[in-house]
């Protein structure tokens, strides 16, 4: 069986690997943060499709109102202009 002290001492190679890992993490941390922010912005941003659909819906609604009032007013005007009513 090994001694208790042997488990607490680390090999120089392991210490070196741990140090390299810390340095690598410090280097990549801003890159990871930027990637995370970009993904979040992409997820919450309004896309071109949504804007196009909203504009199309508003246009269709305006066209429906216009057609309704056009037809409503044009039938009233035609009734007033009938020459056969004399």
UniProtKB/Swiss-Prot annotation:
Membrane topology: Single-pass membrane protein
CC annotations in GO: endoplasmic reticulum membrane
Nucleotide-binding recorded as keyword: no
Domain of life of the source: Eukaryota
InterPro entries: TRIQK
Annotated keywords: Endoplasmic reticulum, Membrane, Transmembrane, Transmembrane helix
Compartments in which it is found: Endoplasmic reticulum membrane
Name recorded for this polypeptide: Triple QxxK/R motif-containing protein
Source organism of the structure: Rattus norvegicus (Rat)
Source organism phylogeny: Eukaryota, Metazoa, Chordata, Craniata, Vertebrata
